[in-house]
């Protein structure tokens, strides 16, 4: 017959600590530190040690046999600004040079360069586009412009109605993985942050394009930068228009956008940034909402206004 036997080990429990001579720690004749190991570990933990990096970022540019150290690109994948190497999340950065080399026509074409980003487009030139990350849906990402959420609160179908043109963009940050803690519940699978260029000098740029099927487009940008005492000013205004009759039935579209950015910096102590944007487009949906009717049309209007204060 089997009998279950429980062996109970002797143990000591401390309800209080005493500094008397007969106390246990004093009898040992040694100094005992409680909890010092965890404190020391946290004080020496580096961001690089806990980072998840897809690829190692080399910030050195080799040209003509000489090495040039490039400036680090700060990303917004955390509460505090940090470089790509320090980010604890997978962050892909599409630089301005990448955009030039890709010869892209729209922002949606640029997003196709990022690993893990799925861009599904049912019209030309970025019309009616759905964007998703890592196999998620179009409602599970957040689109930001200079850190400001510009996602449509009603549906993710209109997330690509950007109020900026491709010429306004400095770089694009793609944050893969859950980011709801930082950017809200819609950032379930990630977030995309579009960072615009900051005016460094005075300049004017304009372009006009045209093609078959009544395609026409025009855009322009004006910027200026100057200093008054300890204040640094940077202003930029841009606008664009594009239309086409479409290569197939019910694929015509007409779209336009306008964007303005005002930046003020005071003696490297604080920055004030204000941005204002508007985007409008109308297009043929081409049986998107129902297969019963061939001719379907939709019109969307988006507006953006934000004011940000940053302390150094």
Where are the model-predicted features located?
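Membrane-embedded beta-strand positions of outer-membrane beta-barrel proteins
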Residues: 111, 192, 204-208, 235-239, ...
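N-terminal periplasmic "start-of-domain" segments of outer-membrane beta-barrel proteins
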Residues: 68-100, 130, 259
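Short acidic/polar hinge/loop motifs at secondary-structure boundaries
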Residues: 130, 148-176, 194-197
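Non-catalytic regulatory/gating segments with a bias toward low-complexity or hydrophobic composition
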Residues: 91, 99, 111, 172-173, ...
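Extracytoplasmic beta-strand/coil segments of soluble accessory domains associated
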Residues: 83, 108, 112-148, 170
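Short strand-turn segments of transmembrane beta-barrel domains in outer membranes
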Residues: 191, 196-226, 238-239, 244-251
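Flexible loop and strand-edge segments within Gram-negative outer membrane beta-barrel domains
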Residues: 244-251, 255, 269-312
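Outer-membrane beta-barrel channels and translocator barrels
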Residues: 138, 199, 226-231, 265-269, ...
């Amino acid at each position: 017959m089997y009998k279950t036997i429980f062996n109970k080990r002797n143990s000591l429990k401390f309800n209080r600590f005493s500094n008397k001579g007969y106390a246990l720690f004093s009898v040992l004749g040694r100094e005992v530190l409680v909890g010092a190991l965890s404190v020391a570990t946290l004080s020496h933990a580096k961001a690089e040690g806990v980072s998840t990096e897809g690829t190692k970022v080399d910030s050195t540019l080799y040209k003509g046999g000489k090495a040039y150290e490039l400036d680090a690109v700060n990303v917004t994948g955390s509460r505090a600004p940090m470089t790509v190497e320090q980010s604890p999340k997978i962050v892909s950065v599409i630089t301005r040079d990448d955009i030039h080399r890709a010869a892209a026509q729209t922002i949606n074409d640029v997003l196709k360069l990022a690993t893990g980003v799925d861009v599904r487009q049912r019209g030309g030139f970025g019309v009616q586009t759905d964007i998703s990350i890592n196999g998620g849906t179009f409602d599970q990402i957040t689109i930001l412009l200079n850190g400001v959420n510009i996602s449509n609160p009603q549906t993710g179908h209109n997330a690509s109605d950007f109020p900026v043109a491709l010429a306004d963009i400095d770089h694009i940050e793609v944050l893969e993985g859950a980011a709801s803690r930082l950017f809200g519940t819609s950032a379930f699978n990630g977030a995309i942050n579009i960072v615009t260029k900051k005016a460094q000098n005075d300049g004017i740029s304009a372009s006009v394009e045209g093609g078959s099927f009544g395609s026409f487009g025009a855009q322009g940008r004006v910027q200026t930068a100057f200093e008054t005492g300890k204040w640094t000013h940077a202003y930029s205004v841009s606008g664009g228009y594009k239309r086409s009759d479409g290569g197939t039935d019910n694929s015509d579209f007409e779209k336009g956008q306008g964007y303005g950015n005002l930046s003020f910096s005071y003696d490297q102590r604080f920055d004030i940034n204000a941005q204002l944007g508007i985007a409008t487009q109308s297009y043929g949906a081409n049986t998107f909402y129902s297969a019963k009717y061939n001719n379907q049309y939709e019109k969307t209007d988006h507006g953006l206004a934000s004011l940000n204060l940053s302390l150094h």
